[in-house]
Amino acid sequence: MKLRPAFLLIISCVVLLSAQAPEVEITAEPHHHLALQNPFVRVFKVELAPQAATLMHRHRHDYVFVTLGPSEVENDVQGKPSATLKLKDGDTYFLPGGFTHIAKNLSGQPFRNVTIEFMQDEKARKSPPPKWDEERGMHILEGGTQDILFVKDGVRASEIILQPGATLPKHHHAGPHLLVAVSDLEIRSHVVGQGPMPGHFKSADVKWLPGGYSHTVTNVGKSEAKFITLEFH
């Protein structure tokens, strides 16, 4: 029996479609574990075993990811050539949403990151938030650094590194901010008018903090403290 060319074409299309990875929402991607959600952010802790890959998943919102530990990752964005990323511990990047991809861990150790979606990204594009007093710059501290990395969608990202005993000088948070622990942290926050409060965090821990206060932050641990802050208006 001879098969018609049209029938063979249909069969080929069915096989091709079945071979393509189905697209899932980020909330259904099993390597993305929801850690925190509020009107400002949706935060996922991501862990990918050596040589493993995520499902094809969609990023609908602009987001920042914070790398935990060195890694090498292949980024396969749908409709674009593959790209290889060599990442260092604490590397923090912003990516605009609206794409679908697969991430593959090319290294021999787990790929870990914290992914923070900006839930008000569309609002920020339509009505840009106020400018920050400073949007880029490195501050050298006594025993540490404060590096303002970038401002995206009105959110200011900074990396803080404090050696044991070092203090981040007094500063004011008018709005809320998110803390992402890159290293384990043993810190003390001294809020003006309230006194000192201890903070104990493991690497990858996140904490949402309200605004409306001034404080200093001291590393009271025995090792370097590294963390990322995302500040909101």
Name these PLM-found stretches:
Residues Q20-K45, A49-A53, N75-V77, P81-E159, ...:
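A short, N-terminal "cap"/entry segment at the start of jelly-roll beta-barrel domains
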Residues M1-P5:
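Positively charged n-region of N-terminal signal peptides that target proteins for export
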Residues H57-H59, H101, H171-H173, H215:
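Histidine-centered divalent metal-coordination motifs
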Residues V64-T67, T92, L178-A181, V206-L209, ...:
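Active-site scaffold segments
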